[in-house]
Amino acid sequence: MTHSSAPLASSPGLGVVFGVRGAQARISLPRAEPPATVGDFLALACGPRRLIGVVTEVESERDVPNRSVARVDVMGEIVPDAQGRERFRRGVSAYPAIGDEARLMTAQDLRLVYEGDANAATIGTLHHDESVPARISLTDMLDKHFAVLGSTGVGKSSGVAVILNAVLDKAPNVRVFMLDGHNEFAHCFGARANVVSPRTLKLPFWMFNFEEFVDVVYGGRPAIDEEMEILLEYIPVAKGMYLAQKLVHNDPYGARKIDPRRSGFTIDTPTPYLLQDLAGLIDERMGKLENRATRMHCHRLLSRLETLQNDPRYGFMFEDANVGGDTMAEILSHLFRLDPQGKPITVMQLAGLPAEVVDAVVCVVARLAFDFGLWSEGRFPLLFVCEEAHRFAPADRTAGFGPTRRALLRIAKEGRKYGVYLGLVTQRPSELDPTVISQCNTLFAMRLSNERDQALLRSAVSDEIANLISFVPSLGMREAVAFGEGLPLPTRLRFTELSQEQLPRSETYRLEDRAMGPADRGFVRQVVDRWRGSLGAGRVSEEAAPQPAPTPAPFVNDAAARLEQLRAQILKRGVS
């Protein structure tokens, strides 16, 4: 697009450069309407180019009435390209000189700066001129990760929804996986979202690595060393047993070549095994032990595994624990939308999962996202969005689940090499691991009222931008100061307002809209039933008819019998 700029001399707010220090210029400005203020953009005439800078300080000129002095940080320039068309580019090839003229940028200049390339997407409007769309470069934003920071109740969730909808619109080859910590984004993307709830999630226990599985077994508490050693020894054997049993059915002569104890599987190999096989191995070991204390370790471990298997809250892990089946490819395709079928984004709802396993589940999906990118050589670009990021990658190394932090840090540091990009969302950036957030080169800073959060934000930006951060405590609803690789200049913007149907659930709640009358007893009973159901107790209200106790699922006995059956089959094949 060709832009013809009006001469600076005819522009309002004409000023003159009277001091220069590096890329900073001091400009004498007349008292004009509208007056220049902090955050405004100025254009400086510099030969065939116009230097573009942002006002970071304004004060009265002492000896000259009706004039003010502005300090401007120069950040880019508008220059003609080979075809004579004006283009904006970041950085400068020349510096301002004493006597150069300056003026407030026109709407035409602002549009030129923010028009971007073919992959640019509109996410809102500029605070300085609401007629000018605020556009971001999706390629630059995704390639070097991004973060959205803001206190609760400032429109952060709707801002995230606007950004992700822009990704879906303008980058159809990018799949999006979002961790939804409060189950509020299900309706933000319409029919394009694949919503995975705790009831529909399928994440078999054998896809967990050892650290993740142990964290589930012990509910986030410290593990017992003796029991961990038992798992370390027998999980690889159980994997070998599953493979051997599979070969018995598919290749009778191949089965005798597989020794389950020498199958080559490691503790972390993501291959199926049956929980009853693992239990049978532990039970067999317990039967050979004479030391009561050692036997108790086996007994307690078996009890833990049986409790998990029979707990309906863990059905997403153990529903088919004794059925088998290698479903890893199908699960990866479903979670990461490898075959989108019109739904390129997965919204994984975490509220409703057992609180003690949420960290492990997040760790699993983050690790799987990176590993799939690694082994697929980045053929399927994936944006991994982590809400409540300070919970899963805390700055305090003694808090949280260490492997989850490492999984997110691995994506932050190396993910872009394999087409895995990171988007972080947090209301407490000061509690987020500084190494993780330092890898995010595009930041959207919404209102932050906590001084520690503001201090961290100031430390994360250059001195030129630091003055703009002073706006952060007073930003309005849906407003943000955005800066970094995804934007041409540090920008104060207002995110696009979503329709009522697309708003995150947290932003549709209004106290005045809620019923204030007495609660109906039937409604309260329904709430209690849902409450108990989420804890695995089922419906137990007084109106429910008594039900016979369910028959306990066969566990150790069947597993031991299966082990003996498998050995007999292998020996029989060997003799024949």
Residue locations for each model-derived region?
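Conserved ATP-driven motor cores of ASCE-family P-loop NTPases powering translocation/secretion/packaging/pilus
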Residues: G219, L409-E414, Y418-R494
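Conserved beta-strand position immediately N-terminal to the Walker
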Residues: F146, M348, G423
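P-loop NTPase motor domains
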Residues: N183-H187, A193, F205-F208, E212-R410
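Conserved P-loop NTPase motor module
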Residues: Y273, M477-S576
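Basic- and hydrophobic-enriched, low-structure N-terminal and domain-boundary segments
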Residues: M1-L149, E377-F380, A395
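Glycine-rich phosphate-binding loop of nucleotide-binding enzymes
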Residues: A120-L203, A482, E512-M516, V524-R525
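Conserved AAA+ ATPase small/helical "lid" subdomain
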Residues: E229-N250, S470-E501
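Hydrophobic residues in beta-strands of the RecA-like P-loop NTPase core, especially within AAA+ ATPase
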Residues: L179, C386, V425-T426
